[in-house]
Amino acid sequence: MSDTTQLRASRRAFLGLAGGAAALMATSGTPAQAARVKTSARIVILGAGAAGAALANRLTERLDGADITLIDGRPEHWYQPGFTLIAAGLKPAGYSVSGTTDWLPKGATLVAEYAAEIDPEANRIVTASGQSVPYDYLVVATGLD
């Protein structure tokens, strides 16, 4: 191969390619959207904080027919980046607190209890009250606490 036909990896080549791709995307008119997938999967997300709620939103956008359940006993959702604004006196104390259900997508179910047991052999979660929640897929998004 001659030097003129080889692709050269350089910052200039990358920026040129990225600029061309950005221009092409800007002129496309409609945003790219992933195709929806039909499924009857039972998906349980353990934790309804920022990660669990975000995942539930993405899954309901992309999956048709999935049974999406979140399990979290905490009734309030804490917007943690707002804590610094409260501490600085820029926002009132209640600024960063809202209801957990305010952040969940339509079509997702919230079991407002804490999980007591994960039973991977039976593919189920047992809540603090003894309710059994079966799953095909489990996501543990309980955060740091």
Set out the residue ranges of the language-model regions.
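A short, basic/flexible loop-to-alpha-helix module at the beginning of a structural domain
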Residues: 23-39
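SH3/SH3-like beta-barrel fold
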Residues: 125-127
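Core beta-strand elements of the Rossmann-like FAD/NAD(P) dinucleotide-binding domain
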Residues: 129-137
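Beta1-alpha1 glycine-rich phosphate/pyrophosphate-binding loop at the start
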Residues: 35-109
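N-terminal secretory signal peptides and thylakoid transit peptides that target proteins
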Residues: 2-22
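A conserved short coil-to-beta-strand element within the FAD-binding core of flavoproteins
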Residues: 113-122
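Glycine-/small-residue-rich beta->alpha transition segments that form the dinucleotide
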Residues: 137, 141-145
